[in-house]
């Protein structure tokens, strides 16, 4: 065992080289410094001070809220999704650099402090609402740089498995697991504009109004033309009516039924002759009114015949778009990109790490 080395060891053969034995001065997360620069240019710190309220008093305020929120967010960006990771990251050079002067001097927050911040301070109603406003305003700052006049909103739900008997977790027959079932809204650029954590056993469209309608109102106040896409879980007349009242165009997958298939009977006849190696695709647009609808709406059908398959693949889309049928289908199919954004959230920033017992604490983490 050698003596403890507190100072860098200088090599005799080359004075420009030094060996440092202090692990606290080594980091593998230097890329976060560039994220911190983006954070500064977008005014993230100002938004935190504007929208979050600090309930602490006295010595408990030694670490500013901005430092705590940055540590929480940056930890996830670097792959440290567990609050327990804060213990070893508190002296990491990168996590000390991204904070205020106090963090550089003292080190970042330890696990107990960061856990209290996430599950108690941010869970307060005012701060929880503030997190939503911070997210919305950050995206607005980016949109202001290169903002198209038309915004496409994609809504979808997903499964987040739970870790035990957590509040409001429940078995979902569709996913065949005990889970939470959040609802999310994305734009074409992959920004998650709005979200809501929900119990595991609710319908995919449950609570759509409180997630979607405020986002539509926000976008229209910015002078944007809003277009909406969603899968068949959102094929509900109340959704069509709400969108039409607000002048929002939409393309929503419609579940097949006998009435719809009778309207396209001529498309379902297999082409005569030897089957083509390439799919044979047919389109048709027509007016259709279900019993639960107050009026008829345009429906676009797509029928595909594939080599080696006995029956055609049939899909229906209810839409208020005025483009031709092929363009409607092509536009709707881009909705699948939203599923990739969800995968990115699960795999890249670990949004599935909702391991707190309390439902509100998990809402904060999401």
What are these regions (language model features)?
Residues 1-201, 206-221, 243-246:
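Dynamic "connector" segments at or just before major functional cores
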Residues 3-17, 21, 249-347:
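An anionic, glycine-rich sequence signature occurring as long contiguous blocks
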Residues 152, 225-227, 249:
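Hydrophobic "anchor" residues on beta-strands that sit immediately upstream
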């Amino acid at each position: 065992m050698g003596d403890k080395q507190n100072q860098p060891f200088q090599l005799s053969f080359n004075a420009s080289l030094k060996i440092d034995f202090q692990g606290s001065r080594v980091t593998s997360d230097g890329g976060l410094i560039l994220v911190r620069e983006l954070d500064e240019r977008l005014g993230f710190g100002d938004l935190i001070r504007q929208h979050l309220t600090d309930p602490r008093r006295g010595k408990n305020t030694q670490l500013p809220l901005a430092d705590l929120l940055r540590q929480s967010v940056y930890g996830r960006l670097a792959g440290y999704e567990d609050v327990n990771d804060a213990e070893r990251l508190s002296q990491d050079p990168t996590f000390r650099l991204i904070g205020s002067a106090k963090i550089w001097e003292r080190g970042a927050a330890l696990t107990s402090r960061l856990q209290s911040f996430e599950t108690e301070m941010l869970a307060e109603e005012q701060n929880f609402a503030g997190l939503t406003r911070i997210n919305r305003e950050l995206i607005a700052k980016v949109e202001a740089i290169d903002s198209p006049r038309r915004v496409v909103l994609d809504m979808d739900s997903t499964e987040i498995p739970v870790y035990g008997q957590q509040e409001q977790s429940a078995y979902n027959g569709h996913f065949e697991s005990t889970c939470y079932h959040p609802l999310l809204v994305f734009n074409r650029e992959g920004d998650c504009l709005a979200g809501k954590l929900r119990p595991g056993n609710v319908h995919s469209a449950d609570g759509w109004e409180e997630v979607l309608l405020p986002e539509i109102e926000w976008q229209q106040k910015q002078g944007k033309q809003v277009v909406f896409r969603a899968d068949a879980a959102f094929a509900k007349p109340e959704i069509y009516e709400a969108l039409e009242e607000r002048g929002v165009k939409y393309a929503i997958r419609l579940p097949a039924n006998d009435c719809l298939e009778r309207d396209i009977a001529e498309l379902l006849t297999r082409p005569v002759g030897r089957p083509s190696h390439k799919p044979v695709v047919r389109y048709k647009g027509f007016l259709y009114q279900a019993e639960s609808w107050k009026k008829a709406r345009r429906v676009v059908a797509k029928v595909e015949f594939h080599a080696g398959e006995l029956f055609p693949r049939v899909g229906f889309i209810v839409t208020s778009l005025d483009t031709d049928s092929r363009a409607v289908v092509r536009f709707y199919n881009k909705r699948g990109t939203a599923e990739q954004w969800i995968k990115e959230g699960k795999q890249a920033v670990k949004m599935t790490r909702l391991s707190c017992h309390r439902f509100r604490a998990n809402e904060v983490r999401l």
